[in-house]
């Protein structure tokens, strides 16, 4: 259920603040499958958001790229773990979104208040927030090397979708960082 919830949460964070606030209220029942009606409603809303995006940009040339929020980091995390069961895709996406949220704040795009609200939701649902739980500092190069292989990168820079606020992302290709910048940022998790 965690993997599915990662995608539901992602859709709320990138395009629908009201949906995110609804998830704050109902997320625990959804993730624990305590209320089937809420689960169905969340899946329906999530699919509707994704469908709207895909229909507007079938070739993934612009808007559809926002669906990659958290995934560039996630692919780096999965690759660094050799795509093993130690970190499944949903967990990697949850962790990737948290790292992207922290970077959004560091780049002064996303307020501390919004970051706190998102992290509180993660904590209430016992979702992954700690990169150090899965990776040692010496694995950062491996993570970034996998991130560099992403097909959406431009001009030898890692293309990222970040949050400006809950329900709104940066424009596709607005944030493209050199691998050294990503390494420096990831190193900041290890004092």
Predicted regions and their residues:
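Short glycine/serine- and small hydrophobic-enriched flexible loop segments
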Residues: 7, 79, 98-106
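Active-site His/Glu-centered metal-binding helix of metallohydrolases
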Residues: 69, 73-77
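Residue-level signal for inorganic ion chemistry
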Residues: 71, 97, 166
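C-terminal charged capping/lid subdomain of soluble metabolic enzymes
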Residues: 109-191
């Amino acid at each position: 259920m965690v993997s599915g919830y990662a995608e539901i949460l992602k859709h709320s964070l990138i395009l629908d603040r009201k949906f995110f606030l609804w998830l704050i209220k109902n997320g625990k029942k959804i993730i624990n499958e305590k209320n089937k009606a809420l689960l169905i409603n969340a899946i329906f809303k999530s699919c509707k958001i994704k469908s709207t995006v895909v229909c507007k940009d079938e070739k993934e040339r612009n808007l559809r790229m926002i669906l990659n929020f958290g995934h560039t980091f996630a692919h780096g995390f999965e690759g660094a773990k050799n795509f093993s069961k130690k970190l499944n895709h949903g967990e990697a996406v949850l962790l990737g979104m948290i790292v992207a949220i922290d970077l959004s704040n560091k780049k002064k795009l996303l307020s501390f208040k919004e970051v706190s609200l998102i992290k509180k939701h993660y904590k209430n649902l016992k979702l992954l927030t700690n990169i150090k739980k899965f990776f040692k500092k010496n694995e950062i190069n491996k993570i970034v090397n996998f991130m560099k292989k992403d097909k959406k990168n431009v001009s030898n820079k890692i293309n990222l979708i970040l949050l400006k606020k809950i329900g709104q992302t940066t424009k596709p290709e607005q944030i493209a960082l050199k691998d050294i910048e990503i390494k420096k940022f990831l190193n900041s998790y290890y004092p």
